Curated annotation (Swiss-Prot):
Source taxonomy: Bacteria, Pseudomonadati, Bacteroidota, Bacteroidia, Bacteroidales
Top-level taxon in the UniProt lineage: Bacteria
Protein's name according to its UniProt entry: Demethylmenaquinone methyltransferase
GN (gene name): menG
InterPro entries: SAM-dependent_MTases_sf (IPR029063), UbiE/COQ5_MeTrFase (IPR004033)
Tagged with keyword Transferase: yes
Binding site for S-adenosyl-L-methionine: T69, D90, D118, C119
Gene3D superfamilies attached to this UniProt entry: Vaccinia Virus protein VP39
């Protein structure tokens, strides 16, 4: 199995972060609809369950990494009353432009701001945030360990990192059903609806390549988190990870 850093959307010599930026800029207008479609609407449920895991920490400031179109940032503001400010960072300007429209429609533009930044080089001081979140974005990092180190760095002491990510089921028959769906359904439907064949071939490949469950929890511990654990969701097709600084 290839390392996640070697799995890229396009067959070019460009660095992974540049390819990921180009991919999301291209599919931004289709992203939300396809996200809901391919997850059978469960992506909303997964976000709500993930948010409940950081709510007890009553954060005031949250950094949402790989914020995309802002779905998680918006849900955080809706469901965690203590949150005063969410800063969303992403490589893709087109995704964040859609996010800005959604934020304005929710009258949350005084609580959510967007910045085009690389998660591997965050422009924030150490100990800047009460929580850091990343949903469906970790597998797109050019270097997952470096990304974890950066998110750890900007967290306050005792604060949580919450990662929500797609995962490969390991139990029968969910594993077999998922493999068929990921290999045959997602690429075909994604290519038809988004007009980007590579983007929805990359999706299942990037899920398969990234560290999961115990491996990712161990990686979180290795960069300094004093505690790391995870919870599987919906027949193992999604996982929430928590790391405490």
């Amino acid at each position: 199995m290839q390392s996640p850093e070697r799995i890229t959307p396009y067959d070019t010599e460009c660095p992974k972060n540049e390819q990921v930026e180009a991919m999301f800029n291209h599919i931004a207008g289709h992203y939300d609809r396809l996200n809901h479609l391919f997850s059978w609407g469960m992506d909303r449920v997964w976000r709500q369950k993930a948010i409940r895991m950081i709510e007890p920490f009553a954060p005031h400031t949250v950094l949402d990494v790989a914020t995309g179109t802002g779905d998680l940032a918006i849900e955080i503001c809706r469901h965690i009353p203590s949150v005063k400010q969410v800063t969303g960072v992403d490589l893709s300007l087109e995704m964040m432009r859609i996010g800005e429209q959604k934020v304005r429609s929710e009258n949350l533009d005084n609580r959510i701001t967007f910045m085009q930044k690389d998660c591997l080089d965050l422009p924030f001081a150490d100990h800047s945030f009460d929580a850091v979140t990343v949903a469906f974005g970790l597998r797109n990092f050019q270097n997952i360990k470096l990304g974890l180190e950066e998110m750890y760095r900007v967290l306050n002491e005792g604060a949580p990192l919450m990662i929500l990510e797609l995962s490969r089921p390991v139990s029968f028959p969910w594993k077999q059903g998922y493999n068929f769906y990921a290999s045959h359904v997602i690429p075909v439907v994604g290519r038809f609806l988004s007009q980007d064949a590579e983007a929805y071939t990359y999706l299942p490949e990037s899920i398969a390549a990234m560290p999961q469950r115990e491996e990712l929890a161990d990686l979180m511990l290795s960069v300094g988190f004093r505690e790391a654990y995870y919870r599987s969701l919906s027949l193992e097709v999604a996982t929430v990870y928590m790391g405490l600084k």
